[in-house]
Structures are given as C-alpha cells and as structure tokens.
C-alpha cells in the first residue's frame, strides 16, 4: 500500500533494487492515491484509510471474530494511523507497527529491512500482544 502514484513502487524497485523488484512481482501493490485521490483530493490520510479498508473488504472469507494480527510496516505516521483504524473492524485484533525512518537513504533503508527481517520471528511470536517499533537515526547520523 503506497500513497505514491500507480506503478511508482514497481518502477523504483526496478531502478534501485532489482532483486526486490522480482519479489514484488508476486505481491499486490496498491496505490492509495490511485484508488482515492479523485474522491479525496489532497487528503493523503483519507487515501490511506480508505485503501486499507478497501483491501480488508476485498478479503471475503475473513472471520472478523477470531484473534487477528494486523501488521504494518511504513515510514509515515499515516500508515500507523490507518492500521490502527483497521482494529475497529475486528472484535479481537492485535496491532504490530514497525515505523521506519522518513525519507531514508538507500543505505539506511537496506539496514532497516535487514534488521527487521532478522526479527520477524520474534515479532510474530507475540501473536496475542500489540507491538510498536520505531526505527530512528542515531544522534550522530
């Protein structure tokens, strides 16, 4: 889910991260801007909220009464807020948010992804708990 224009994620990954681009071909990338910009011009928060809700609605066989983990990775508080708003659609939801640095360099993004990828098992091991992780810059960076 991106607030970028349709195709932006695919184009950027092809240019900067060709190996990642191949993986992304197997994942549905949704442009919140593409879905919602006409209805909510300039309201990027609403784009993300409505796109998250639309993605949830597209899962027809989901049981909203069983314990559910909502996991959000993003570099903006907007994703964190939109994922929090999804909790209201479940009777028993646990939210796990991983907020990356805003506007990271390529090197910083690679470090963030490597760190989180090594911790995914422990993040998911706490399936019955909420969790919030915020990646920040060191003071001297």
For every predicted segment, state its role.
Residues 7-141:
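C-terminal cap/substrate-recognition subdomain and adjoining C-terminal extension
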């Amino acid at each position: 889910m991106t607030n970028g224009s349709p195709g932006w994620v695919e184009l950027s990954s092809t240019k900067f991260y060709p190996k990642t681009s191949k993986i992304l071909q197997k994942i549905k990338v949704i442009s919140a801007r593409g879905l919602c910009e006409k209805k909510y011009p300039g309201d990027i928060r609403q784009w993300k909220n409505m796109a998250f809700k639309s993605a949830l609605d597209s899962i027809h066989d989901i049981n909203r009464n069983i314990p559910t983990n909502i996991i959000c990775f993003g570099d903006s508080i907007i994703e964190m807020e939109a994922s929090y708003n999804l909790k209201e659609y479940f009777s028993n939801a646990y939210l796990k948010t991983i907020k990356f640095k805003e506007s990271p360099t390529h090197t910083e993004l690679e470090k963030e992804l490597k760190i989180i990828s090594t911790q995914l098992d422990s993040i998911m091991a706490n399936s019955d708990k909420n969790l919030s992780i915020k990646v920040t810059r060191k003071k001297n960076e």
